[in-house]
A protein has these predicted regions:
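A short, N-terminal "cap"/entry segment at the start of jelly-roll beta-barrel domains
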Residues: 1-43, 70-142, 153, 186, ...
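Glycine- and acidic-residue-biased ligand/ion/polar-headgroup-sensing regions
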Residues: 39-67, 158-183
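Non-cytosolic beta-sheet module surface loops
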Residues: 46, 89, 156-158, 214
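Short hydrophobic/aromatic-rich beta-strand segments that constitute the beta-sheet cores
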Residues: 63-65, 80, 98, 153-154, ...
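Conserved metal-binding segment of the jelly-roll/cupin
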Residues: 72-91, 147, 195-216, 220-225
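A mid-sequence, solvent-exposed acidic-amphipathic segment
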Residues: 146-151, 155, 159
Length: 251
């Protein structure tokens, strides 16, 4: 697979048209895409704490999970703590995102289920985030929507590692081009950009400057370590400070 490095950010391109599993990111977490067959029964059992998110399903498809009474719809999430997820698909294919860890949750066991409308929402000046697995102690899985013409902070993380996957739209990745300057002193003229299109991933390690600018409306799904408040905003169009901003929560 072709990997390009931009200021420490690793960019990969994927072709996700085939049935089966495609690994999107790995390290402290595992993150993969799974496309089912038209009619298939599949068991996910390799992770101890993980989310199964229904990214896309055709009209008329039926998705059921052993131990969950409700039929799944697009955008729904099943959370597993310490047990396999047995999924049955009829009239697919259905496209799933699965993320989690081999490390178990310290307290919880069993399956839980959430509809898309009930996922934890964080309002952003550039769009929104949905924290698909809530504020989990082992890993994070997010949906990120960024409106055309807006951009995130130019930021870095002290501890957080993340894999962002662009599924819809066109974006620019901003990165540090002037390696002779510290992250906290970077100005716009010290950065460069590269365009990314679907389906591309951006792997971001701690201390790596990055920013996404939406050329069109864009939709990403990010898996990361659970350091959700670990953000240092070097440049921000809305002058937001570092860290978690309570005004963005509870919406």
């Amino acid at each position: 697979m072709n990997i390009q490095i931009f200021g420490g950010n690793a960019v990969k391109q994927f072709n996700l048209g085939s049935q089966g599993k495609e690994l999107l990111g790995a390290g402290p977490y595992e993150y993969f895409y799974y496309q089912t067959g038209t009619d298939e029964e599949v068991v996910f059992s390799e992770l101890q704490s993980f989310s199964v998110f229904v990214y896309n399903m055709p009209d008329g498809a039926v998705v059921t999970i052993e131990g969950v009474a409700e039929k799944l719809e697009q955008g729904d999430r099943v959370q597993s703590e310490g047990q396999p997820v047995s999924l049955k698909v009829q009239d697919g294919p259905v496209r799933l995102l699965v993320a989690g860890t081999i490390r178990p949750h310290p307290e919880l066991k069993g399956l839980s289920f959430a509809r898309y409308a009930d996922l934890y929402r964080v309002a952003k000046p550039w769009g929104h985030e949905l924290w698909i697995n809530g504020q989990h102690p082992c890993y994070a899985l997010k949906e990120i929507f960024i409106k055309a013409g807006t951009k995130t902070s130019l930021q870095y993380h002290n501890f957080k590692q993340e894999t962002n996957v662009l599924f819809q739209g066109t974006a620019k990745l901003h990165y540090k081009a002037n390696v002779g300057i510290s992250n906290d002193q970077v100005k716009s003229e010290d950065t460069s950009t590269t365009q990314i299109k679907p389906v591309s991933s951006v792997d971001v390690m701690p201390k790596t400057l990055h920013r996404l600018e939406a050329m069109t409306d864009i939709l990403l799904y990010e898996t990361s370590t659970p350091h959700l408040d670990d953000v240092v905003r070097v440049l921000d169009d809305n002058k937001r400070p570092d860290g978690r901003l309570e005004m963005e929560h509870g919406v």
